[in-house]
């Protein structure tokens, strides 16, 4: 329970950081007249992704560490039912939490920005909504990936290292590949699926991705599907 408060609290820190960032760039804009700054809901998204991915990992690894998994299996003997229930709870909780945090960050930053030209506040909410929903889905996908890896590895440290590698290490390493392989591989990496779902450029360096929105969404769903399948069979075959 304590870890849940900590992880959700860390994710919610995005709102505070978003307010601080918007105030900072607003002051700069008042001095310079105009400024193009990164949107806080995009810049601080990795904080939410990592925090709630930790929650997904701990949902299963904490029970293995404390032995509570045996109690859970006594209450719910069917491992498929137990794992499906955990998957559903993590999915609903993380999507609701992430979407709420993203929307609150979005609204507060635009209210603070006012009429200032900061770059990120020049588009309408309806234009930004696909990216916000895609960001929320990415958080849920990472949390479910964490759950699947945690079930497969039964190690908090191992699962977290894998999540961090997927979220930060691999995207960073791909940037150093020669073109066009950097863009081709980056197109399939989880963090780069968000702009493709929203029909946006991945980055100025990588350019446009190769996936249409529906295909990017399918790849995003494939990440948790694969890891959850592996985690389920690991839970089913190994002794608690």
What is the role of each PLM region?
Residues 156-193:
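Transmembrane helix segments
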Residues 1-5, 77-79, 154-156:
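Short loop-to-helix capping motifs
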Residues 28-32, 64, 68, 108, ...:
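Membrane-interfacial segments
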Residues 219-240:
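Junction motif at the cytosolic side of a transmembrane helix
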Residues 6-7, 11-57, 83-152, 169-174, ...:
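Secretory targeting signals
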Residues 5-6, 68, 81, 158-159, ...:
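Residue-level recognition of membrane-helix boundary sites in multi-pass small-molecule transporters
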Residues 34, 56-75, 79-80, 87:
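Transmembrane helix boundary and interhelical loop/hinge segments in multi-pass membrane proteins
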Residues 68, 103, 144, 160-161:
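Transmembrane alpha-helix boundary/hinge residues in polytopic small-molecule transporters
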């Amino acid at each position: 329970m304590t870890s849940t408060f900590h992880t959700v609290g860390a994710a919610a820190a995005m709102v505070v950081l978003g307010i601080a960032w918007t105030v900072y760039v607003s002051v700069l804009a008042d001095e310079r007249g105009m400024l193009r700054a990164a949107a806080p809901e995009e810049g601080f998204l990795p904080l939410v992704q990592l925090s709630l991915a930790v929650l997904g990992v701990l949902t299963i690894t904490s029970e293995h560490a404390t032995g509570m998994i045996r109690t859970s299996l006594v209450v719910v003997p069917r491992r498929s039912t137990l794992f499906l229930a955990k998957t559903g709870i993590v999915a609903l909780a993380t999507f609701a939490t992430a979407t709420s945090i993203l929307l609150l960050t979005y609204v507060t930053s635009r209210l603070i920005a006012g009429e200032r030209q900061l770059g990120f506040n020049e588009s309408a909410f309806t234009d930004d909504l696909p990216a916000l929903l895609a960001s929320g889905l990415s958080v849920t996908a990472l949390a479910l990936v964490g759950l699947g890896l945690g079930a497969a590895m039964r190690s908090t440290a191992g699962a977290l290292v894998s999540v961090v590698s997927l979220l930060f290490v691999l995207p960073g390493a791909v940037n150093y590949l020669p073109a066009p392989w950097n863009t081709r591989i980056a197109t399939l990496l989880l963090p780069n699926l968000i702009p493709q779902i929203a029909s946006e450029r991945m980055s100025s360096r990588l350019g446009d991705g190769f996936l249409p929105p529906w295909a990017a969404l399918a790849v995003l769903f494939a990440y948790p599907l694969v890891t959850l399948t592996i985690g389920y069979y690991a839970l089913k075959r190994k002794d608690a």
